[in-house]
Every structure is written in C-alpha cells, then in structure tokens.
C-alpha cells in the first residue's frame, strides 16, 4: 500500500494541511504502517498526488524531521527514522505543547502544572 492510498487532507477541517499530513504520518508510524526505513515520496510527488502546494508537504516533512520521525538523506530522499516511534511521537507532541504554552505566555512551571492535572482515563 502506498502513502497516497491512505493519506488524506481536508481543506474544511479547520486544521492546517501541513499539520494534517504530519499527524497522519505519525499515526502511520505508530500503527506500523510506515516501518523504519520506509522511503517517503518526494515533496513534489506527494504534493501532486494530494493536490496541495509543495510548500505544504515540505513544511510537514521539516516538522517530522525536527521531531526525529523522518530523516532526509540528501538526494536519496526522506525516510522514516529508525528511532522508537513512541519517542518520536511524544517529542512532536511536546514540541507542539511548548509552542502553544509559549504563545499563551506561560512560564515553564505554569505549563507543567497543566500537565500534572490531566485526568487519567
């Protein structure tokens, strides 16, 4: 199965397209659909397949790379990293949480307070 077969973007979702792509790749890694070493389509190829701008896919790939979920090997392409997907997913979630906390002007201790009060399911 190819990435384009299950990767979808919804312009009406109220969530940025690059973030939809990023989240779906993370979900694919966590579910085992994208095992370590899987080569992802080029930015242009995936953008063309999904009907989105190349910059949208490029931003999703950059964010995935900064969270160590994918690694770019120069002209050889972009691949799913060999790191533990749980670690990579949690790093991405933490980065997003920190970004929101900073945007709200919270201190580190205030942000941590919110985490300690999350109810158990």
UniProtKB/Swiss-Prot annotation:
Main subcellular location: cytoplasm
SUPFAM superfamilies according to UniProt: Winged helix' DNA-binding domain (SSF46785)
PANTHER family: HTH-TYPE TRANSCRIPTIONAL REPRESSOR YTRA
Protein name: HTH-type transcriptional regulator Rv1152
SMART domains linked: HTH_GNTR
Entry-linked Gene3D superfamilies: Winged helix-like DNA-binding domain superfamily/Winged helix DNA-binding domain (1.10.10.10)
Domain of life, source organism: Bacteria
Pfam entry (one): GntR
Single GO cellular component term: cytoplasm
Keyword annotations: Cell wall, Cytoplasm, DNA-binding, Secreted, Transcription, Transcription regulation
């Amino acid at each position: 199965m190819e990435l384009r077969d299950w990767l979808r973007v919804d312009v009406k979702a109220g969530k940025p397209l690059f973030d939809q792509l990023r989240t779906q790749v993370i979900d694919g890694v966590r579910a085992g659909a994208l095992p370590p070493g899987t080569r992802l389509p080029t930015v242009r190829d995936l953008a063309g397949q999904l009907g989105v701008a190349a910059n949208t896919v490029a931003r999703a790939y950059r964010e995935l790379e900064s969270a160590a979920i994918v690694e770019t090997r120069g002209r050889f392409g972009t691949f799913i990293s060999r790191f533990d997907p749980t670690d990579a997913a949690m790093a991405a979630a933490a980065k997003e949480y920190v970004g929101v906390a900073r945007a709200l002007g919270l201190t580190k201790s205030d942000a941590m307070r919110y985490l300690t009060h999350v109810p158990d399911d």
